Amino acid sequence: MNNERIYQVLKGLVFSEKAQVLGDTAGVQVFKVDINATKLEIKKAVEKLFGVEVVKVNTTITKGKTKRFGRTLGRRSDVKKAYVTLKAGQDVEMADLGDTAESAAE
């Protein structure tokens, strides 16, 4: 998997109370991912980008709501989240992302 695809697959971390509790207790990190990304792609992207070992990946798709924008009806985009379980004792640090991005650019 090339670096361009990694950054297409992983859109960012999810910062919520549920994600915080899962990260602290169960070693699970929550990412927003591309709607077309597979579990295998997500696993490879996290392992390559953060240098951690992934045990399993669970995904969920949240359907976008229909909302009113003035007079017209619109629809928000669907969002796919990946719950990534890491090997015991490992953690994803945002500082790791900066180091990897710099080394990948070289």
Curated annotation (Swiss-Prot):
One of its GO terms (molecular function) is structural constituent of ribosome. The keyword Glycoprotein does not apply. It comes from the Bacteria. InterPro entries: Nucleotide-bd_a/b_plait_sf, Ribosomal_uL23-like, Ribosomal_uL23/eL15/eS24_sf. Keywords: Ribonucleoprotein, Ribosomal protein, RNA-binding, rRNA-binding. The keyword Ribosomal protein applies. GO terms for biological process: translation. One of its GO terms (cellular component) is ribonucleoprotein complex. Belongs to the universal ribosomal protein uL23 family. One of the early assembly proteins it binds 23S rRNA. One of the proteins that surrounds the polypeptide exit tunnel on the outside of the ribosome. Forms the main docking site for trigger factor binding to the ribosome. Part of the 50S ribosomal subunit. Contacts protein L29, and trigger factor when it is bound to the ribosome. This is Large ribosomal subunit protein uL23. It comes from Acinetobacter baumannii (strain SDF). The gene is rplW.
